[in-house]
């Protein structure tokens, strides 16, 4: 066993704490270790690595491996961030004839969405899961049809609906049936994509909240596994998100590169890092502008969007496109950075640095901004820890975790890296993290352009070996995007798991909404910088008057800005 492989002391700790439980182990890369354990010990093993060894649950997913070993499998991927930093994936095999395994959620709350999704997509039952509602599948989906099973269905066909009624039950954990309900949706508060929010209120005060997403689930994983070649999935991953598409394509390509042991040239690695920071600029500036809008500071909104346009020009100069770059390929980058383009980019970065500083000085000195954001939408550090939140959201709650620093990928090992965190846990803290990251992104772009290594852009001539697997990851503006790929034997992926950053943050939104007012809801939701398919209406349920009212989003937005003439009255 090579000593350069990280995670050996975690493996030793597992064997000491649970003798005979680890059935197999293997390293995919020097810092990625997968351990297969006895299924009955799964909750204890994940809890041990999570709370006692400093792990964070990054993603969990199922896999139909009946053609490979006769079983289903469930994978729990943990980012180990205390002491030696590496990745440990806990794998269990699930009997194909009795598709059940013990739920981890009662011990590690971060597992709740992943286990619900595994149940929806594979029919694997997490016994003891506290929330047994569907997560991804609609109410009218047939009970015994599981989309990601290899023998289940043709992804191009949608089965006939089984019911016309909505059967999903929204849960009010802290209130009772006396609470009023405010439904928001099924479209989102900033009109991106659809989701349904339901606020349980007493007058103006939010007692609890619940929400349902996945109204436009696109079936990308099934599409990739059945219809696309390896590099075609690269362009599909570029379109997972309208803002952080390059982060997704970077995470996907690195997952395959890690599985195949492909060493990408340093020049391509650095170009990837530079473009990821350009993407961070226009995403954070968009969010800062929207925060101004939600607090009634529309001149700030317009000015931040004006400066954001400079970052879009920067992207166009470097890539030829303002948004979806299409530059990543497995093994490297399709297009080089030209000398004149780099000179223009440096000039734009200097201009942006001055303009952002002027805007931030105005923003942070605006009394209404402080009144509307300080102490609002608090996310306690303990809740963030329990649910493995990511990105500016977790960093604003006192946890200085950032994949760029914890697990340096692409060119970040060559760049000066500073992780910004805040202790306030509220909306203003999340804004401050993003502000600091804008400055850091500009510095990293300058440094990367000044120190761009020479050499080729691509590695070619490699072959794909079936059934190799590994993780790929990227720190997108909203947090880390995690991809896991297993190669197949027909020049297609056997399994692709794509987890966007917001997926890791949604489960804690209800805790952030509790104790605030209805007029704060758009600002709190916006502080996640959510990426989900969006809502135009909200349902408000008054717990005292025992009635619900549908509030159009424009009314909710107006109320958030003006703070008068409540739409609930």
UniProtKB/Swiss-Prot annotation:
PROSITE patterns with a match to the protein in the record:
COMPLEX1_49K
Instruction: Output this protein's name.
Output: Formate hydrogenlyase subunit 5
> Is this entry keyworded Protein biosynthesis?
no
How does the cofactor bind to this protein, according to its record? Binds 1 [4Fe-4S] cluster.
The family annotation for this protein states:
Belongs to the complex I 49 kDa subunit family.
Which cysteines pair up through disulfides? They are none
As one GO molecular function, the record gives:
NAD binding
Give the record's GO biological process terms.
anaerobic electron transport chain; anaerobic respiration; formate oxidation; glucose catabolic process
Q: What does the UniProt keyword field contain?
A: 4Fe-4S, Iron, Iron-sulfur, Metal-binding, NAD, Nickel, Oxidoreductase
Indicate the residues removed as propeptide on maturation. 538-569
Q: Does the keyword ATP-binding apply?
A: no
Family annotation (Gene3D superfamilies): Cytochrome-c3 Hydrogenase, chain B (1.10.645.10), NADH:ubiquinone oxidoreductase, 30kDa subunit (3.30.460.80)
Subunit structure as annotated in this protein's UniProt entry: FHL comprises of a formate dehydrogenase, unidentified electron carriers and a hydrogenase (isoenzyme 3). In this non-energy conserving pathway molecular hydrogen and carbodioxide from formate are released.
| Entry's Gene Ontology cellular component terms | formate dehydrogenase complex
Q: Name the cofactor(s).
A: [4Fe-4S] cluster; Ni(2+)
């Amino acid at each position: 066993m090579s000593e350069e492989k990280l995670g050996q002391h975690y493996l030793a700790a597992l064997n000491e704490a649970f003798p005979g439980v680890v059935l197999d182990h293997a390293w995919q890369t020097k810092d990625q270790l997968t351990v297969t354990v006895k299924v009955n010990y799964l909750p204890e093993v994940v809890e041990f690595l999570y709370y006692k060894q400093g792990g964070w649950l990054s993603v969990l997913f199922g896999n139909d491996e009946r053609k490979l070993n006769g079983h289903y499998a469930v994978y729990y991927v943990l980012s180990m961030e205390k002491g030696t930093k590496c990745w440990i994936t806990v794998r269990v095999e699930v009997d194909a004839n009795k598709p059940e395994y013990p739920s981890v959620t009662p011990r590690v709350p971060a597992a709740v969405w992943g286990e619900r999704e595994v149940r929806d997509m594979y029919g694997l039952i997490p016994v003891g899961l506290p929330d047994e509602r569907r997560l991804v599948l609609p109410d009218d989906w047939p009970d015994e049809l599981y989309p990601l099973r290899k023998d289940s269905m043709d992804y191009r066909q949608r089965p006939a609906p089984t019911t016309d009624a909505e059967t999903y039950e929204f849960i009010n954990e802290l209130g009772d049936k006396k609470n009023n309900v405010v439904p928001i949706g099924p479209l989102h508060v900033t009109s991106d994509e659809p989701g349904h929010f339901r606020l349980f209120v007493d007058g103006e005060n939010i007692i609890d909240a619940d929400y349902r997403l996945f109204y436009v689930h696109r079936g990308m994983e099934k599409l990739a596994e059945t219809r696309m070649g390896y590099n075609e999935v690269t362009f599909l991953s570029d379109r997972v998100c309208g803002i952080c598409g390059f982060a997704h394509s970077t995470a996907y390509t690195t997952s395959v590169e890690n599985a195949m042991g492909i060493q990408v040239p340093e020049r391509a690695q650095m170009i990837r890092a530079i473009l990821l920071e350009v993407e961070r600029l226009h995403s954070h500036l968009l969010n800062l502008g929207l925060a101004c809008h939600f607090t009634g500071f529309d001149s700030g909104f317009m000015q931040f969007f004006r400066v954001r346009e400079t970052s879009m020009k920067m992207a166009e100069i470097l890539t030829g496109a303002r948004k979806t770059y299409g530059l990543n390929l497995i093994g490297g980058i399709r297009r080089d950075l030209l000398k004149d383009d780099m000179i223009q980019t440096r000039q734009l970065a200097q201009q942006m640095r001055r303009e952002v500083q002027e805007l931030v000085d105005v923003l942070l000195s605006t009394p209404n901004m402080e009144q509307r954001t300080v102490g609002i939408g608090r996310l306690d550090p303990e809740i963030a820890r329990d649910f493995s939140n990511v990105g500016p959201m977790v960093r604003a709650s006192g946890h200085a975790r950032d994949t760029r620093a914890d697990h340096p990928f692409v060119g970040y090992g060559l760049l000066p890296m500073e992780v910004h965190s805040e202790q306030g846990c509220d909306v203003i803290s999340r804004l401050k993290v993003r502000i600091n990251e804008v400055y850091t992104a500009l510095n990293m772009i300058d440094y990367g352009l000044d120190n761009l290594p020479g050499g080729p852009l691509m590695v070619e001539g490699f072959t794909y070996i079936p059934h190799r697997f590994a993780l790929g990851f990227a720190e997108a503006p909203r947090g880390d995007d995690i991809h896991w790929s297993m190669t197949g034997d027909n020049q297609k992926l056997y399994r692709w798991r794509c987890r966007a950053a917001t997926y890791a943050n949604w489960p804690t939104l209800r805790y952030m909404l509790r104790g605030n007012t209805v007029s704060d809801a758009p600002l709190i939701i916006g502080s996640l910088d959510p990426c989900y398919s969006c809502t135009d209406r909200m349902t408000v349920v008054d717990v005292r008057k025992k009635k619900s009212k549908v509030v159009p989003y424009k009314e909710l937005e107006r109320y958030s800005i003006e703070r008068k003439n409540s739409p609930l009255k």
